[in-house]
Amino acid sequence: MSPVNESLIDFPCDFPIKVMGKSHPDFQTTIVEVIRQFDGGFDAERVEVRPSSGGNYTGLTVTVRALNREHLDDIYRALTGHPMVKVVL
């Protein structure tokens, strides 16, 4: 039997995170600033941006360098706690 805390993810790794929020001119820049608090080498040029069909929401895919489970959890907490963010996957 495998240990309960064993992760299915091998760290460190590049981990894609999808972030969705209301469309706003500063949404992408703000999310990049949040990510850079945890990944100083994050390349903002690699952010994938997808507006919703109605243009009311924006979806971003950001690929972060996750060092361990706690690091990844901290990134998720910072994103989900941000007022501009509606959903993080």
UniProtKB/Swiss-Prot annotation:
InterPro entries: UPF0250_YbeD-like, YbeD-like_sf. It holds the Pfam family DUF493. Gene3D superfamilies: 3.30.70.260. Disulfide bonds: none annotated. Belongs to the UPF0250 family. NCBIfam families: PRK02047.1 (NF002533). This is UPF0250 protein Bphy_0213. It comes from Paraburkholderia phymatum (strain DSM 17167 / CIP 108236 / LMG 21445 / STM815) (Burkholderia phymatum).
